[in-house]
C-alpha cells in the first residue's frame, strides 16, 4: 500500500503505476506502460473496478476519477481477473457513441498478444457479449491473417522466449 491506498487504487489514480511495477515487464506487454487504466479513470464520469483474486472479489467505484470509498472485499469467488466498467465524461467527450468494431479489433489484438487469458467485451445496450481467447497467441494470429493463403512453410516457426530481468533465454 502506498499512502494508505490499495495497490488497485494506486494503479487507478496514478500515471505509470501499472500492474507490472517495473520496466522489465513491459518488454513483453501489450499495454500502455502504466497509463491506460488511470487515463480511462481520469476521463470517466463513473468507473467501477472489480478484482477477482485469491478466492475473493474486491470492489471499488470512482466518480470523476476519485474513489467513492476504499477498496472493499465483496464476497468469495472462484474466478480470476479484473472487470472495468466506465462511463466517459461529457466534460471531455462531445460524442459518447462507441465504435464497437474498433474496440473489438483492439481487444482481439490484445488477446493474441496475451495468450492464455480471456478478454470479454459486453455491449450493455444490446446485451451481446464477445469473448477473445487464444492459447496459441501470435501463432494463431498469423494463421488467422493467412486464412486461405498459401504458406511458405508447412509449420509456422515460432519461438516463445523466457524473459528474466534484462535477459531473454
Residue ranges and their predicted role:
Residues 1, 150-159:
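Core mixed alpha/beta domains of very large multi-subunit molecular machines
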Residues 14-15:
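Mobile ATP-lid/nucleotide-binding loop of the nucleotide-binding subdomain
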Residues 1-7, 18-144:
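GHKL-type ATPase core
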Residues 157, 164-169:
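GHKL/Bergerat-fold ATPase module
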Residues 11:
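Short basic (Lys/Arg) and small-residue
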Amino acid at each position: 500500500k502506498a499512502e494508505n491506498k490499495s495497490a488497485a487504487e494506486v494503479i487507478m489514480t496514478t500515471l505509470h503505476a501499472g500492474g507490472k511495477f517495473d520496466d522489465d515487464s513491459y518488454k513483453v506487454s501489450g499495454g500502455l506502460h502504466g497509463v491506460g487504466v488511470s487515463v480511462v479513470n481520469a476521463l470517466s464520469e463513473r468507473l467501477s473496478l472489480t478484482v477477482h483474486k485469491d478466492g475473493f472479489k474486491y470492489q471499488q467505484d470512482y466518480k470523476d476519477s476519485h474513489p467513492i470509498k476504499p477498496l472493499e472485499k465483496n464476497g468469495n469467488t472462484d474466478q480470476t481477473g479484473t472487470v472495468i466498467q466506465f462511463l466517459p465524461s461529457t466534460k471531455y467527450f462531445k460524442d459518447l457513441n462507441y465504435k464497437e468494431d474498433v474496440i473489438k479489433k483492439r481487444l482481439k489484438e490484445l488477446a493474441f498478444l496475451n495468450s492464455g487469458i480471456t478478454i470479454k467485451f459486453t455491449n450493455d445496450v444490446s446485451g451481446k457479449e464477445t469473448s477473445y481467447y487464444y492459447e496459441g497467441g501470435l501463432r494463431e494470429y498469423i494463421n488467422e491473417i493467412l486464412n486461405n493463403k498459401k504458406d511458405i512453410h508447412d509449420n509456422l516457426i515460432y519461438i516463445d522466449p523466457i524473459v528474466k530481468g534484462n535477459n531473454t533465454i
